[in-house]
Amino acid sequence: MVPKIYLSADRLLEDSFRLGNLVFDSGFRPTHIVGIWRGGAPVGIAVQELLEYRGVQSDHIAIRTASYTGIDQQEPQVRIYGLGHLVDVLNPEDRLLLIDDVFDSGRSIRALLKELKDRCRNNLPDEVKVATVYYKPSRNVTDLKPDFFVHQTNDWLIFPHEINGLTTDEIRAHKHGADIILR
């Protein structure tokens, strides 16, 4: 069985700042940042804050993808919600950064890129990059790879906000605020 790694909110925030530094140090200066809801939203906020602190101004939003129906269970189709703003404002000279917490199968990013190409057509930015805190190459079913990542792993990651699917004992042992959750 693959070991479970329980991530703390502090660790995820620090790694999100590390991810922001990787983007900044590469010389890439996004004009638009998209945090992919759910897990990519807090990572995207931290990356955007760090880049702005370093003088990089960007438009930033969250969009949602959906395909998971349970732990390790996905529907064949990835659904995407909330692209309207991007479709309205993107231009070829823009630089787009897509951010998620984990690049697992790659299906969500692949579907998002296809939807952006289909809807933006000639206005799709020439530069589109993908950043993620965790990259799982052994689970990747696409020909894509994130441009920026902090950790490469095959472990089962339990993010700070995740409690569904955990046992009471796991929550007690690994979740800050377990008494609030289990009341």
List the model feature ranges, each with a label:
Residues 1-183:
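PRPP-associated nucleotide enzymes
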